[in-house]
Amino acid sequence: MDPDWGQRDVGWAALLVLFAASLITVLGWMLQYARGLWLSRADGGRDSRPASAAEPGGSLRELGVWRSLLRLRATRTSTPEEAGVRGLLASLFAFKSFRENWQRAWVRALNEQACRDGSSIQIAFEEIPQLPPRASISHVTCVDQSERTMVLHCQLSAEEVRFPISVTQQSPAAVSMETYHVTLTLPPTQLEVSLEEIPDEGLLVSWAFTDRPELSLKVLPKLQTRERDEEQPELSTVEELIKDAIVSTQPAMMVNLRACSAPGGLVPSEKPPTMSQAQPSIPRPTRLFLRQLRASHLGSELGGTEELCCAAELDNPMQQKWTKPMRAGPEVEWTEDLALDLGPQSRELTLKVLRSSSCGDAELLGQATLPVGSPSRPMSRRQVCPLTPGPGKSLSPAATVTAELHYEQGSPRNLGTPTSSTPRPSITPTKKIELDRTIMPDGTVVTTVTTVQSRPRVDGKLDSPSRSPSKVEVTEKMTTVLSESSGPSNASHSSSRESHLSNGLDPVAETAIRQLTEPSGRAAKKTPTKRSTLIISGVSKVPIAQDELALSLGYAASLEASMQDDAGTSGGPSSPPSDPSATSPGPVDALSSPTSVQEADETTRSDISERPSVDDVESETGSTGALETRSLKDHKVSFLRSGTKLIFRRRPRQKEAGLSQSHDDLSNTTATPSVRKKAGSFSRRLIKRFSFKSKPKANGNPSPQL
């Protein structure tokens, strides 16, 4: 056996192994390549089917053969999905906001299309036409689709869509404007809906009629009774303009596709997190204030008696605010502020400049649209927007409207939720004045003026009247006139001076007591600021020849003497004065008497701030004497309150007989003390009846004096 044969066998074996390995490697690569090619072809056949439908062009597309085949294939393949797409569109139109935005997009596109026509007759569609409930969308099919676009065909039908339009006709002589009511009947018409995804913005939805539909229009002027002259446009012309605008327009709207946190709770299968407190929500603008509204470069032809106003319209929720009209001119500025409530869906704000015409209508000169409601924008900024001319109007290219936008921040969880907070008391001082007037049969007028003054503050203390103004509410009751037989206690005035009532008072006194004790319409509330003033005015029984000051001082001295008589009767024997001149001091003595000094010392600062002085009351009422009581809180007196004043006023005329007993005190000022005590005037009886029952204490405190 040849030894070289073994070496040659080993070499051949090694070559065979290398060849087999190479062959296996090549087969493996071939199988892998074939598998990848097969998978790519399978996936490409599914994905490129609609895309390949858009590739062929030329004569096939022009002849419509390829399109017919594609439509047939698309219809057959999308038949199971038609119900789903139709249900999606129906669900979107079920939302009020989507439906309103859809209608608003229609109106905006119609107005833009109508403005493109350069004829002398311009039409303007007013927002917002009512969508009929019978409007339906059917036969929804997908005819084209790519990575970012989709084209749908659907059938739209609506019955009697009613909306108003404004028609403006310009002529060399004048400009006329009239409103028309339009009734539109839309038969089943095919509509093409295009969906396009725009990065970082949302989904752009646009629609248009594939073919010219057969529209049925009925146009009626708003003022049918007015005779139409030659200057008014023909109804047929208006109908043609409306049809052209509806058919030629292509509305579009943007649908937001940004992700947001779900407002609902967690998924039931998930467990709630262990966090004790949720992070507070970020506040966002909830209220928008428009300030310093200004329209510039409007044109030099504006002026005269015309007036301009600015209207601000928010898209969602729909709001409209107007400014006060200002005199027209090239530069117009409105000083008042406009407030608008923003919502989560607020996107656009429209500013309109309107001109008031001679017939009372408002003509749109121009408008501008600016975005609002974005949390990323600054909270306060100044915005300058160019004005787009209104229908049939011409403005300067430099016409602008300027507004300062100020956002007021608020938390979203507080929107629409009433917060229960304690109402803050009003810090404005209030004063309520009630007047009650009664006219007695003899002509005596009994008037009670009750003043309730409140000065609430945050700390609960009363403030000075000079620090803050007061709100005064005056309530005057109906004047009561008593006849001869309808006195307070059915007592005739013709009775003698000694015929008193069962309680010892005459009709004047009873009327005064009734007015002071009668509950008023307000709630009974004890307050240290309540003050009642009783004014009794009438005629004097004897001529007044004395000086005014001497008469008032003498009257005060007589009251003081009567109090000394009462004190002497209850406390111990005292000799009554025998001469009026001895008991009635002169003007100088009366002003410098210890009693006056003592009363001045006892008058506290609160009494001065709460009650007006006697001089002030006398200057207003012309009284000849005043009687003011001190605090009666510790005494059993029902009708006299703290700060009650009895003011007796006389009239400068005479009456000889049949006068009220309340004016006996004027005649008793010059009589002797014995005659004055025997006569028993009204003032003495009133003081005796309501005098203090308690005796002076032994500690030396002075007895209260009236």
UniProtKB/Swiss-Prot annotation:
A GO cellular component annotation in the UniProt record: endoplasmic reticulum membrane
Domain C2: 268-389
Residue ranges, compositional bias (Basic and acidic residues): 602-614
A biological-process GO annotation: positive regulation of insulin secretion involved in cellular response to glucose stimulus
Disulphide connectivity of cysteines: none
Record Pfam families: C2, SMP_C2CD2L
Residues that bear Phosphothreonine: T417, T419, T428, T621
TM annotation in the entry: 10-30
Chain positions with Phosphoserine modification: S59, S358, S374, S411, S464, S468, S470, S613, S619, S623, S638, S660, S662, S674
Self-association state and partner proteins as the record states: Homodimer.
Its biological purpose: Lipid-binding protein that transports phosphatidylinositol, the precursor of phosphatidylinositol 4,5-bisphosphate (PI(4,5)P2), from its site of synthesis in the endoplasmic reticulum to the cell membrane. It thereby maintains the pool of cell membrane phosphoinositides, which are degraded during phospholipase C (PLC) signaling. Plays a key role in the coordination of Ca(2+) and phosphoinositide signaling: localizes to sites of contact between the endoplasmic reticulum and the cell membrane, where it tethers the two bilayers.
Domain notes for this protein: The SMP-LBD domain is a lipid transport module, which binds glycerolipids with a preference for phosphatidylinositol (PI).
Protein name: Phospholipid transfer protein C2CD2L
Primary gene name: C2cd2l
